[in-house]
Amino acid sequence: MEEPPLLPGETIKDMAKDVTYICPFTGAIRGTLTVTNYRLYFKSMERDPPFVLDASLGVINRVEKIGGASSRGENSYGLEIVCKDIRNLRFAHKPEGRTRRSIFENLMKYAFPVSNNLPLFAFEYKEVFPENGWKVYDPIWEYRRQGIPNESWRLSKINEHYELCDTYPAILAVPVNIPDEELKRVASFRSRGRIPVLSWIHPESQATITRCSQPMVGVSGKRSKEDEKYLQAIMDSNAQSHKIFIFDARPSVNAVANKAKGGGYESEDAYQNAELVFLDIHNIHVMRESLRKLKEIVYPNIEETHWLSNLESTHWLEHIKLILAGALRIADKVESGKTSVVVHCSDGWDRTAQLTSLSLLMLDGYYRTIRGFEVLVEKEWLSFGHRFQLRVGHGDKNHADADRSPVFLQFIDCVWQMTRQFPTAFEFNEYFLITILDHLYSCLFGTFLCSSEQQRVKESLPKKTVSLWSYINSQLEDFTNPLYVSYSNHVLYPVASMRHLELWVGYYIRWNPRMKPQEPVHNRYKELLAKRAELQKKVEELQREITNRSTSSSERAGSPAQCVTPVQTVV
């Protein structure tokens, strides 16, 4: 059986026999290549067990033809497929078989449906799961969990129809003493109308994390009394501190350069009691180039002799360090300094999302559970308008687009670094993080499609597509960390130092069979979870037994016929 197992809504579009997969690790393998409207599937019966390569079309970045009909040499005529998840796939066709053209055309059509006016596969996929993952995040419930509304913060529906800001969610948490009319004036002074709104409030000190975009200061140093009053209101909502910190994610030279485009940063003269801190995190273009360099050194082969210097030259871990260090400073100001903070970059949907979501993960144990993490992604990334469509390029053949960048990948990498430093603090495991990244590209689920809440509502994604959380929550045992201990009120302070960071081998080098763990970790997780459940059950039984014994002892102690010496129960 060489055909792929099909998902509901998946259909075969093309098939070519006698194709050779040029595996960079084990050499050439001959088999059958199938293209469906969702995946590329290669199967070879030459190996035992049969060799299978299964990749979603959404992961394809570009497809190139290699060699012409007159190419000499074995395996010199075929296709090179460059993927978004580090891999490159190379297939050789027989020139006389005429299968290359057909496979190429179908790959170009179904890997890039947006460029061909076709629907993404998420709209065709019809799997039914026990739970509707689109209902995981309810903003009203999440704000209520944080104690909002309260005497200082209210929920505004001014953006109900996305008219104040088309990249913000419908419901916004804002200072209680700033009326909606004033919010409009603040929006006119913030890039793309992205006003400072609440992300998180400390349950004890009431110190807050608010997020926004840069102020439109420009070269002339424009001011807005409404914006200044607004930030003062944010500061005043926290009685513990008479100061507010503004964390600008950018390097200061970039922030200054933005003035020429009408943007800029808050001057400490205009914003009384505010302190401005630059976090030196580079822009999307620098990050894209860093990942390109990383791919060069990890795939397909690793050069042992210069591994450390090669890794250093990519600057990837340096960028991860700066993002983690920035989030750590924010979390520390809120937790230890009891001070409210405002976070922004240029537009407030890339570096800002990285910083707020990571600092929330450090401060609030709820987000370290599986469901809490799903809420965090829905809230800080999806509802606040991270431009997934542009950064990932779902179904778009324009692989050289300057808007592409691994912003969300860096966030997940930072989360993985935290799970390494705190192995018992997170309910989810590494496989959970890898699954999220795989489906960032796959276009199987609707979760990461579009670039704003408004677009998702307009496209009716919750009605027409399946949520990734529906799938994950239907098999939680696969994604659960058996070492997890629920200390919900613990604040995590990861060490953001190069000595404590390492390359995420389980993701970036997972295609190399030599890097696979000797023992399948996944199976071990399941065994540990079963053992944990068994021990938990025993503990509960013993606790019940102790309760029953102490109850019967106290009953006997209270009866008139009780002897003078009480019976002591030692457990």
UniProtKB/Swiss-Prot annotation:
GO biological process: phosphatidylinositol dephosphorylation
Catalytic activity: a 1,2-diacyl-sn-glycero-3-phospho-(1D-myo-inositol-3,5-bisphosphate) + H2O = a 1,2-diacyl-sn-glycero-3-phospho-(1D-myo-inositol-5-phosphate) + phosphate; a 1,2-diacyl-sn-glycero-3-phospho-(1D-myo-inositol-3-phosphate) + H2O = a 1,2-diacyl-sn-glycero-3-phospho-(1D-myo-inositol) + phosphate; 1,2-dioctanoyl-sn-glycero-3-phospho-(1-D-myo-inositol-3-phosphate) + H2O = 1,2-dioctanoyl-sn-glycero-3-phospho-(1D-myo-inositol) + phosphate; 1,2-dioctanoyl-sn-glycero-3-phospho-(1D-myo-inositol-3,5-bisphosphate) + H2O = 1,2-dioctanoyl-sn-glycero-3-phospho-(1D-myo-inositol-5-phosphate) + phosphate
Gene3D superfamilies with a match to the protein in the record: Pleckstrin-homology domain (PH domain)/Phosphotyrosine-binding domain (PTB) (2.30.29.30)
Binding site for a 1,2-diacyl-sn-glycero-3-phospho-(1D-myo-inositol-3-phosphate): N258, N283, I284, S346, D347, G348, W349, D350, R351, R391
Annotated binding of a 1,2-diacyl-sn-glycero-3-phospho-(1D-myo-inositol-3,5-bisphosphate), by residue: N258, N283, I284, S346, D347, G348, W349, D350, R351, R387, R391
Subcellular localization, as worded in the UniProt entry: Cytoplasm; Early endosome membrane
Topology versus the membrane: Peripheral membrane protein
Annotated GO CC locations: cytoplasm; cytosol; early endosome membrane; membrane
Active site: C345
Domain GRAM: 1-67
Ranges in coiled-coil conformation: 521-553
First-level EC class: hydrolase
Pfam family, one: Myotub-related
Gene Ontology molecular function terms on file: phosphatidylinositol-3,5-bisphosphate 3-phosphatase activity; phosphatidylinositol-3-phosphate phosphatase activity
Myotubularin phosphatase domain sequence ranges: 133-508
Quaternary structure and interacting proteins, as annotated: Homooligomer and heterooligomer.
Family: Belongs to the protein-tyrosine phosphatase family. Non-receptor class myotubularin subfamily.
Protein purpose: Regulates the level of these phosphoinositides critical for various biological processes including autophagy initiation and autophagosome maturation.
Protein name: Phosphatidylinositol-3,5-bisphosphate 3-phosphatase MTMR2
